Regions:
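Non-catalytic, usually N-terminal nucleic-acid engagement modules in DNA/RNA processing proteins
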Residues: 1-24
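Short loop/turn segments at strand-loop or loop-helix junctions that form parts
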Residues: 1-6, 30-43, 99-105, 155-159
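Surface-exposed cleft-lining segments at the edges of enzyme active sites
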Residues: 3-11, 39-51, 70-77, 104-110
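Acidic (Asp/Glu)-rich catalytic clusters
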Residues: 19-32, 60-66, 89-95
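Structural preference for beta-strand elements that scaffold enzyme active sites
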Residues: 32-35, 68-74, 96-100, 130-134, ...
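Active-site-adjacent beta->alpha loops and helix N-cap segments on the catalytic face
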Residues: 45, 49-58, 108-121, 140-143
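Distinct, well-ordered alpha-helical segments
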Residues: 80-91, 110-123, 144-147
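C-terminal accessory extensions appended to soluble enzyme cores
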Residues: 139, 144-169
């Protein structure tokens, strides 16, 4: 199965060490909102690999919230059924007030971007709640997202990418 080497380190620590790291973050950062890790879903791996990644996202979200750090649940999905699962999960957890999504990678491709925006809008309706969406990229579908969520915070990827590529804004 596929791995996300950069964020796999989180799981190399036992739960007590993860709780300690979250407590350190809470003390050092003060009032913040974090987004949970975006464990990738891949098309070329067994389906249960995706479901395992979604489970890890939910566990990481809970560990932050349980540790007193406000967290946006990252919605990573490949199928309509994945979005339905997330809607069911969120509907049963009133402590979920913020969700996150990123259009910076394959979800931001033309065609796929619009599909994800429509799925996110359907997700928001299915939860029956006023959720705040934190979204990275996706300015082209911002109107769809803004009409579906109570609030949207857009994190622009342009400045970051130009910095990485050492280009002027």
């Amino acid at each position: 199965t596929a791995t996300d080497p950069v964020i796999e380190r989180w799981w190399s620590h036992e739960a007590p060490r993860r709780r300690s790291a979250i407590a350190e973050l809470r003390e050092a950062a003060g009032e913040v909102l974090v987004t949970t890790p975006n464990y990738s879903l891949f098309r070329d791996v067994p389906r249960w690999d995706d479901l395992h990644a979604m489970k890890r996202i939910a566990i990481a979200w809970w560990e932050f919230v349980d540790g007193g750090v406000p967290a946006a649940l990252h919605l990573n999905a490949r199928t309509e059924r994945d979005y339905e699962r997330w809607a069911h999960f969120v509907s049963n957890r009133p402590e979920v007030t913020h969700v996150a999504f990123e259009f910076g990678t394959s979800a931001g491709r033309p065609g796929r971007r619009e599909w994800h925006a429509a799925q996110l809008a359907a997700f928001a309706r299915a939860t029956g709640r006023h959720l705040h969406l934190v979204v990275r990229g996706g300015i082209a579908v911002l109107d769809v997202l803004a009409s579906a969520f109570a609030r949207v915070t857009l994190l622009d990827t342009t400045a970051f990418m130009k910095t990485v590529m050492r280009r002027r804004l």
